Amino acid sequence: MPAGQHRYVAFSFTDYVADVSHNTLTYVLAARQNSSWGLGLSYLHYGDFTQRDAAGQEAGKFSAADYALSLTRATTLDHFTLGASLKLAVSAIAEYKAVALLTDVGGIFKHPGKDLTIGLAFKNIGYELRSFTGQEREPTPFDVQLGLSYKPEHMPFRFSITAHHLQQPDIVYLDTTGQARQHQSLKKSLADQIARHLVLGGELLLSKNLNLRLGYNHLRRKELRLENAPGTAGFSMGLLLRIKGFQLDYARAFYHQAGASNFFTVGTDLGRFFKKKDPASS
């Protein structure tokens, strides 16, 4: 929640490739001076599909989607903010459903004298309550992330770096079929193993109401680019715009030559619409 705002609401829409879309609604309430509560609802729709029988004959339609409801609590102590989210996640494919109970925990440190922020998060700690088949349960997508952002003094730039999947040192995937990656080296270099954990970002602060952003995801580029036409896979760009109390965020992320995804977010402080009347003025 942006500083100085007490009842913040935000809506996000992501236009992925094909018919896949992701919607998120978030509401954050400042309970006391140093704490806040948050409620979130997320819906990821994968589209509609044609169902076929064993002989390949059409047998109707089905859809697939993921849902998640989250409750978050955050508390600020001096220069540290600690928080945790409890999430109920449901995944549905046709008549099959899986349910999981998850939690995210993390902390943020803000330097008292510099524009420096460091964050650590443990995401998707939990247990699958119900599997698609009702038999063996799948592990949750656990992820440990460490992030840092820094704005040098007197410079209109902010730099950020995020390390993900720290619980798994080697996340390099090599295609050994000899078809899709005919010219790919089957040797793993230490530099590549480290780089695939990192996401780099830069932000040009043109004013308090307009920022331009650029990002690079090395893992995404290495896994999704075409060898003969890598293009802009792994790169992203966007902007932040503030207009009359509303904050608009837009980003375009390039995954593959086949297309890119668009991310839209609009947020505002509801308190500005329900300001209490000053008794002295009546």
Residue ranges, per PLM feature:
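Subset of outer-membrane beta-barrel
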Residues: M1-S282
